Regions:
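Alpha-helical transmembrane segments and their helix-start/interface "positive-inside/aromatic belt" motifs
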Residues: 18-29
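Internal/C-terminal transmembrane anchor helices
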Residues: 132-136, 175-211
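Membrane-interface segments at or immediately adjacent to transmembrane helices
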Residues: 204-296
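Hydrophobic alpha-helical transmembrane segments of polytopic membrane proteins
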Residues: 2-18
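Membrane-embedded alpha-helical segments of integral membrane proteins
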Residues: 109, 122-176
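Terminal transmembrane helical anchor/hairpin motif
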Residues: 36-120, 145-158, 213-219, 229, ...
C-alpha cells in the first residue's frame, strides 16, 4: 500500500508537469510541503503568541500528518508499531485511492499541445503560486525577524517578507515560462499576494484573532485537562491502567512538546480550578509572565478542544495545585501506579530531612506494602490544603516484573513490551497531613522535621552577581551583619549561633523536599553540618535550599555579598 501511494503520487506529478525541472520540484513539494508549512506555523506561534501551545493537535496536526503522502506513510508506520493502526490504515487507503483517481484523471485529460510547458494545466499556475509564495514570504520574514536581538527586529521582518515574496514569486514565473525576462510578468498577482502576506503578518503581530485572549465561559465548558509536569517535577510518576487479562498499560508523564500530555489525562470541572486558570490567563494577558510553563486543554460542550500554554508564578501555581489536589479524579490518575499488584513492589527508599537516602523495610515485604497503601489512602483522603505545607519526606517505590503491553515514554513514543516484564520507579512527596504514612515512617527513626536535626553550624555560600561591581550604588552603603569570608566565586558565612540556626531551620529544606512550584534562589548554597560531622569545604555534603521566609540577617549578608537574586516567593 505504501509503495502504491508513492507510485500514484509520482504518476500524478508526471501527468501534471511537462518539464523535468518542474516535475522534480513538484514531486519534492508534494511530499514535503505540509511538513515545512506546519513547522513554519509552529515557529510563528512561538514567536508571536505568549500562550502558544507547542504540541500538535487539531488543524495543525491535520496539516502535518495528512497534508502529504510522506506524512501519511510515517503516521501509519508509527501507529503500526504500537498495534493500534486501524484509523491510519483507512486514511492510507483513502489517500491511495484519491491519488490513483487524480493521476488517472490528470493523464486522461492531459492535452498534447501543453506537454512542453512547465505545467500541463495552466490553471494550476496561480494556485501553486499562491500556495508557495505566501508561506515563503512569511517564512523568509521569520528568518530575518529572528536574526537581530534589538528593536530593529520589526524592520528586518518587514524587509524579509517583501524580499521573500518578490523573490519566490519571480522565480516561479521564470520556471513557468523558462525565461528570466518573465520575472515580473504578473505584477497585479504579486501585489495581491503581498497584501495577503501583510494581512497574515499583521494578524499575528497584534493578535487580531484574539489567540492570547481566549478563555471559555464556565457555562460553555465541558471540562479542562491540565498538564503540570513542569510545576511538580520533584515527583516522578507514571499512569497505570490494568487490563482485564492482568496486563498493564503504562504511560509516563508527557513532556511539554507532545500533545499526549493533554490527551490522556482526566477531564475536570470545578469553580476553584476555573478561577485559578482565569487568574493565570489574566496575568499572562497583562504581560506579568514569570515562573514556569503549564499546559491546558479546554473542552467546550460541543466537544471541540483548545490548548494553551501559560507562564505561572509561584503563588498562582500554589493556588492551582490546591485546586487540583481537591479533584479526586486527578489524584486517582496522577497516582494510579498504586494500582500495581503488591507482588511487584520490590524496594522502597526514602529521603528525609537529613538529606540522605535510606532503604526502608528491606526484609519486610508486608511493611513495604502497608506503607504504599497508607500513602495511597492519605493522598486520596486529603485535599488541597495539604500542599500548603512543605514536604517532610520523599518515598521512592521500585516495581519490577510487571506484565505489560509496553509503555508510552515521557516523549509520547510507544516502547514495546519486554519478556521479563517492565520496571517502574516512582517518587512521591510526603506531607505533614499524611498521618498514616508518618506513623509508619516514625518507626524508622529517620528525621521527619528540621527540628529533629542537631545542627552544629551552617555554611552559606553567596555567589556574587557578575553585574554587581564594588561601586554599584545598590551595594555601596550595605554593611554585612556577619563576617564575610571571600571565596573563588563569592563569599562564605558560617552561622553557628543558636538563634541563627533556629531561624534557618524554619526556612530551609533538602532540595528534594521542596514543592516543585516553589521558586528558590540559585545564587545561594547552604551546607548544613550536623553535630559530630566535619565540613567538606563546599565540595559535597548536606545541602539545603530556601523553602520559607528568609531571615533578615541572611538578606543583609546577601546584599553585602552582592547577591542580586536572593529570592523566595511565598505561595501564600
Amino acid at each position: 500500500l505504501m509503495y502504491l501511494l508513492v507510485y500514484f503520487s509520482t504518476a500524478l506529478v508526471i501527468a501534471c508537469t511537462g518539464t523535468m525541472l518542474m516535475g522534480a520540484l513538484a514531486w519534492a513539494g508534494l511530499f514535503t510541503y505540509s511538513i515545512i508549512l506546519a513547522a513554519m506555523l509552529q515557529i510563528s506561534g512561538h514567536l508571536f503568541f505568549d500562550t502558544w501551545y507547542e504540541g500538535s493537535y487539531g488543524i495543525l496536526a491535520a496539516v502535518r500528518d495528512l497534508g502529504s503522502p510522506l506524512m501519511v506513510i510515517v503516521s501509519f508506520m508509527d501507529k503500526y508499531s504500537s498495534g493500534n493502526y486501524g484509523k491510519q490504515l483507512l486514511i492510507l487507503i483513502f489517500v491511495l485511492l484519491l491519488m490513483a483517481v487524480l493521476s488517472w484523471m490528470a493523464f486522461c485529460r492531459r492535452k498534447s499541445e501543453n506537454t512542453g510547458k512547465a505545467l500541463v494545466y495552466t490553471w494550476m499556475e496561480p494556485v501553486l503560486s499562491a500556495l508557495i509564495t505566501i508561506p515563503s514570504g512569511l517564512g523568509i520574514g521569520l528568518i530575518f525577524y529572528m536574526i537581530p536581538e534589538d528593536s530593529s527586529k520589526t524592520a528586518w521582518w518587514i524587509f524579509g517578507m517583501i524580499l521573500g515574496t518578490i523573490l519566490v514569486h519571480g522565480v516561479l514565473e521564470v520556471i513557468y515560462e523558462m525565461d528570466f525576462r518573465r520575472f515580473f510578468r504578473r505584477k497585479v498577482q504579486l501585489m495581491i499576494f503581498g497584501g495577503v502576506v501583510a494581512i497574515c503578518a499583521l494578524t499575528m503581530k497584534i493578535d487580531l484573532l484574539g489567540y492570547d485572549r481566549y478563555f471559555p465561559a464556565y457555562d460553555n465548558l465541558q471540562g479542562v485537562v491540565v498538564n503540570v509536569c513542569n510545576l511538580s517535577y520533584t515527583e516522578q510518576l507514571c499512569n497505570v491502567e490494568k487490563k482485564e487479562n492482568g496486563i498493564y498499560k503504562i504511560r509516563y508523564t508527557a513532556t511539554s512538546d507532545n500533545s499526549s500530555g493533554l490527551l490522556d489525562q482526566p477531564v475536570m470541572k470545578s469553580k476553584a480550578l476555573y478561577n485559578s486558570l482565569k487568574d493565570i490567563r489574566l496575568q499572562n494577558e497583562k504581560g506579568k509572565k514569570s515562573g514556569r510553563r503549564m499546559y491546558v486543554r479546554y473542552i467546550n460542550k460541543q466537544g471541540f478542544s483548545v490548548c494553551r500554554s501559560y507562564s505561572v508564578s509561584s503563588a498562582q501555581a500554589q493556588n492551582l495545585m490546591e485546586a487540583l489536589y481537591d479533584e479526586q479524579t486527578w489524584k486517582e490518575d496522577r497516582y494510579s501506579f498504586f494500582q500495581l499488584d503488591k507482588q511487584y513492589l520490590k524496594e522502597v527508599t526514602g529521603i528525609f530531612c537529613d538529606g540522605d537516602i535510606h532503604s526502608l523495610f528491606e526484609k519486610n515485604a508486608e511493611k513495604r506494602q502497608a506503607l504504599a497503601e497508607a500513602l495511597r489512602k492519605d493522598i486520596l483522603e486529603n485535599g488541597g490544603q495539604t500542599v500548603k505545607d512543605q514536604p517532610c519526606a520523599m518515598l521512592m517505590f521500585d516495581y519490577a516484573g510487571i506484565p505489560s503491553e509496553g509503555y508510552m515514554d515521557e516523549w509520547g513514543m510507544n516502547v514495546p513490551a519486554v519478556q521479563e516484564g517492565e520496571r517502574v520507579s516512582t517518587s512521591v512527596l510526603v506531607y505533614p497531613a499524611y498521618k498514616r504514612t508518618l506513623a509508619i515512617l516514625e518507626e524508622t527513626g529517620y528525621p521527619l522535621s528540621m527540628d529533629e536535626l542537631s545542627v552544629e553550624y551552617i555554611d552559606v555560600y553567596y555567589f556574587s552577581s557578575e553585574a554587581a561591581g564594588e561601586d554599584d550604588e545598590a551595594f555601596s552603603d550595605t554593611e554585612p551583619l556577619s563576617d564575610l569570608e571571600e571565596t573563588e566565586n563569592g563569599y562564605k558565612v558560617r552561622y553557628d549561633k543558636k538563634e541563627q540556626l533556629e531561624a534557618l531551620k524554619k526556612c530551609i529544606r533538602p532540595s528534594q523536599l521542596v514543592n516543585g512550584w516553589t521558586i528558590w534562589n540559585a545564587d545561594v548554597t547552604m551546607e548544613v553540618v550536623l553535630e559530630g560531622q566535619e565540613s567538606t569545604g563546599g565540595d559535597s555534603g548536606l545541602y539545603m535550599t530556601f523553602a520559607g521566609e528568609i531571615p533578615d540577617f541572611i538578606r543583609a549578608d546577601a546584599k553585602a555579598a552582592h547577591v542580586t537574586c536572593l529570592l523566595y516567593t511565598s505561595p501564600s
